[in-house]
């Protein structure tokens, strides 16, 4: 699975992307976030309030409850704002 990070999320994590293999216990975006938060405190800080984060699965706007698979591309980014 490829995971992409944008904007302040990328800045806080210090990386724009990473690759990982999913185990069978990871079925949703929420499950993935729980796993990532166990990696280190930077993930815990980024994902403590997911109301300020949007997610896409394979470039489709998605929800945190949506199913994910090992070959998916997941992207985390802040909500779009206009000006």
Q: Residue locations for each model-derived region?
A:
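Ubiquitin-like/PB1-type beta-grasp interaction modules and other compact soluble beta-rich domains
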Residues: 1-81
């Amino acid at each position: 699975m490829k995971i992409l990070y944008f904007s302040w999320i990328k800045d806080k994590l210090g990386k724009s992307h990473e690759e990982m293999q999913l185990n069978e216990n990871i079925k949703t975006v929420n499950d993935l976030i729980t796993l990532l938060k166990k990696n280190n405190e930077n993930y815990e800080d980024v994902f403590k309030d997911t109301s300020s984060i949007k997610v896409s699965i394979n470039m489709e706007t998605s929800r945190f409850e949506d199913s994910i698979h090992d070959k998916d591309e997941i992207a985390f980014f802040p909500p779009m704002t206009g000006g």
